[in-house]
From Swiss-Prot:
Gene3D superfamilies named among the record's database cross-references: 3.40.50.880, P-loop containing nucleotide triphosphate hydrolases (3.40.50.300)
Lineage of source species: Bacteria, Pseudomonadati, Pseudomonadota, Gammaproteobacteria, Alteromonadales
Protein name per Swiss-Prot or TrEMBL: CTP synthase
Pathway(s) the chain acts in: Pyrimidine metabolism; CTP biosynthesis via de novo pathway; CTP from UDP: step 2/2
Residues where CTP binds: S14, D147, I148, E149, K187, T188, K189, P190, T191, Q192, K223
Amino acid sequence: MTTRYIFVTGGVVSSLGKGIAAASLAAILEARGLNVTIMKLDPYINVDPGTMSPTQHGEVFVTEDGAETDLDLGHYERFIRTKMNRRNNFTTGRIYEEVLRKERRGDYLGATIQVIPHITNAIKEKVLAGGEGHDVAIVEIGGTVGDIESLPFLESIRQLGVELGRDRTLFMHLTLVPFLGAAGEVKTKPTQHSVKELRSIGIAPDVLVCRGDRAIPANEKAKISLFCNVEERAVISLKDVDSIYKIPALLKAQGLDQLVTKRFGIDCKEADLAEWEKVVYQEANPVGEVTIGMVGKYIELPDAYKSVNEALKHAGLFNRVSVNIKYIDSQNVEAKGDEVLQGLDGILVPGGFGERGVEGKIMAAKFARENNLPYFGICLGMQVALIEFARHVAGLEGAHSTEFKPETPHPVVGLITEWINEDGQVEERHEESDLGGTMRLGAQLCHLEEGTKAAAAYKSTTCVERHRHRYEVNNNYKERLEKAGLIFSGLSSDRSLVEMIELPNHPWFVAGQFHPEFTSTPRDGQPLFEGFVAAAAAYQKRDLED
């Protein structure tokens, strides 16, 4: 199979939405029957984002094969059917690590190691490997043209453009075309300078996607085409929209997919975007609204919970309600108590690390349990629910996790020392293990107990979800907790680890050790999120009737 490559770069400013634009183009090409994948090349020195602060980098998206990756890979999976893996995301740090490891082994036979050719060759090898087996591979280059950090990646794709030829490569550049209120017009000069910078390093863009708060007038498109040496039909206007799921239709309406297929000489059917039209319609026409309180510690940056936010919205689509997310700092719960939890239709406690704010999350779980308020716990959200139950229902005073209180008299949650990974191999960890790349990661089979809310949600006695954690329920306390009324509704593939818990006499108190948000998409939803939002809508209805 001959793979064609589309390289996506960004200029003028960061956060233009290269990932969304790349994913939207991929969605159109997929709708034309093509097998598409997307890669993200990140210019930072970290080996992966696994140990980076969520408040700086946003969430860490976990792939099926256990790679800790950039949040853009979540966008990719939400827009196309292709599942991402560790080949879809790599960093400058990983490239340097692998090159230096080869140098230490003597693989380079004493050669002087340089950015060109050794680093650039390593980048090219990874790009080509990531595209294998696909009709089209879209490659997003992180950062902004002009950044020092991005230069090795840009040089690598320049070389690939020469080596693969024009019939297998296309360069798409996103820029900002701002509107100046004082002048009453859009300004194209930043785009001209960005393209000039890109051309100075040997890359001539074939397509310009111009971002702005409004559509670019035809005369300004012609001006951009003239000064940037790009065909006028290849100057694409991408204005701000109220839903990212409208973007595939916007790009298709301007013929971007036809431009791509013509360039690559691909003969394929027209794109049918009916599924996306349905998503946009559902999003614009809810019949109700629910308010979900998300109790976390990284709420100053909503991108820290990007996949959770999107999964709640997807669940709203399937329940025909708009989901209003109220972000609640768990430390505020500690300081102010129940008053910050009033007026909610459900509480969700997402994953997280570190002791700060943990007691507030435990208090939120207690509030939901005692008030029959729908509760959904994810990863740490399951652990705090179990700790709360152990303390206040099972009579285990002082119960805690050894992550936060090693000397706790009742360590109901402790470090996982051994488990079966996604390949069926036994992995082991201990307290002295490195933080990076040492968690239980990736897709794992979970056995669901018949008759539970979990099994009802999945309509099955098994599910496969992705994990990212070091701590688990201490099996020594399972019998005591079960006698107190807690249901262990999900167990690991070998039934040695607790994966899900729930309460029997509660409208919806369900929690999982895994991260179901990573498998939610706007077209397919996700069973647990759908069940949770349905329970929130039912709670609101009962509350109004009372």
